[in-house]
Amino acid sequence: MATSWGTVFFMLVVSCVCSAVSHRNQQTWFEGIFLSSMCPINVSASTLYGIMFDAGSTGTRIHVYTFVQKMPGQLPILEGEVFDSVKPGLSAFVDQPKQGAETVQGLLEVAKDSIPRSHWKKTPVVLKATAGLRLLPEHKAKALLFEVKEIFRKSPFLVPKGSVSIMDGSDEGILAWVTVNFLTGQLHGHRQETVGTLDLGGASTQITFLPQFEKTLEQTPRGYLTSFEMFNSTYKLYTHSYLGFGLKAARLATLGALETEGTDGHTFRSACLPRWLEAEWIFGGVKYQYGGNQEGEVGFEPCYAEVLRVVRGKLHQPEEVQRGSFYAFSYYYDRAVDTDMIDYEKGGILKVEDFERKAREVCDNLENFTSGSPFLCMDLSYITALLKDGFGFADSTVLQLTKKVNNIETGWALGATFHLLQSLGISH
């Protein structure tokens, strides 16, 4: 098999990541992601597998990673990834936890088909829920996780203690940053020419980058900085997760649905929607009636005023992001694809101003709307406001939009699996 950047950097991360980290009361930032006492049960096998579930607000995704270790004690090589997903996410089953867990059961069949039976009992299965469950009442989130744990317990796979839990939002940002910068080769050697990462989910959004200026470090609020050592270098990351600022949560805020008690019989209206539209939308297990302004204004300007109220003054704006280079994925990528700004397979490079240009084009032609998402104008306007008025990016800031790097899904799952393998003792 030909050596790829993905292979090279996977080997490097397993051997070189150290956990000298200052985050959340001096604890290691990944403490709690995986149990450090997990036994290296399948270390002696020549082929290793890991099952990682990403339980997001809009869907549940499974990543089945395959690693090859040619000789005992030799560093494993990332050989491939099997990916699948289901919609809606677990949070949609807030009052039917058993039904929610059944969606995970279906994805476990993908793992069974991908992993030889002889390896099942040696392969760990882990589920990390993100913002969708963080938004739920604690007792309801726990009920969902309990049912998932029962599904895991009945499965033929290795189920370590703590394998089903809700992941902290900051960990999402850090692990995604590690994944992208390893796979793009930015952390090779002693260089620190890294790229920042922007992740826009359904319920939350994350921004992570390596500050280059002392001013940024001095002016950053407490809790936004995380230090760790890698390749004999210390990296101090700026990272923060904003709960409630994901794309779909922002729709509710824009519509004013978060300020209204009870949704029955109420239709939420917006200048971001086609004037004639009357529809319903389900998010987080709740049904919302929504529509366009039948008599009021519609179009980009009134729409932008609505989304601006959601973000203005509510996010920290580090000045140096205006000059940084960032990878953007999840809904940034999806909406750019939906509007033909980038290719679905290849991704592409955009400037922040490109999102505003497309938002104006879509919003000012709402009466010609015929297909696709009725929220397209609102989503593009929100992304523009989030980038410019939320994070403080300049119009000219360049964004690399991608779904995969070297054929591996972007996001936190691979970065989390690195730590899973370390906890299994594979790098020893």
Swiss-Prot record:
Locations listed in the record: Endoplasmic reticulum; Secreted
A GO CC term assigned to this protein in UniProt: extracellular region
Reactions performed catalytically: a ribonucleoside 5'-diphosphate + H2O = a ribonucleoside 5'-phosphate + phosphate + H(+); GDP + H2O = GMP + phosphate + H(+); UDP + H2O = UMP + phosphate + H(+); IDP + H2O = IMP + phosphate + H(+)
Activity's dependence on pH: Optimum pH is 7.5-8.0.
Record GO biological process: 'de novo' post-translational protein folding; protein N-linked glycosylation; UDP catabolic process; UDP-alpha-D-glucose metabolic process
Obligatory cofactor(s): Ca(2+); Mg(2+)
Other comments on record: May mediate some of the cancer-related phenotypes associated with AKT1 activation: its up-regulation by AKT1 leads to the elevation of aerobic glycolysis seen in tumor cells, a phenomenon known as the Warburg effect.
Induction: Up-regulated in cell lines and primary tumor samples with active AKT1.
Carbohydrate-modified residues: N232, N368
Keyword Endoplasmic reticulum listed: yes
Family note: Belongs to the GDA1/CD39 NTPase family.
Modification(s) after translation: N-glycosylated; high-mannose type. Glycosylation is not essential for enzymatic activity.
Chief place of localization: endoplasmic reticulum
Keyword flag RNA-binding: no
One function term, GO molecular function aspect: GDP phosphatase activity
Disulfide-bond pairs as recorded: C272-C303, C363-C377
Protein's name in the database: Nucleoside diphosphate phosphatase ENTPD5
Organism of origin: Homo sapiens (Human)
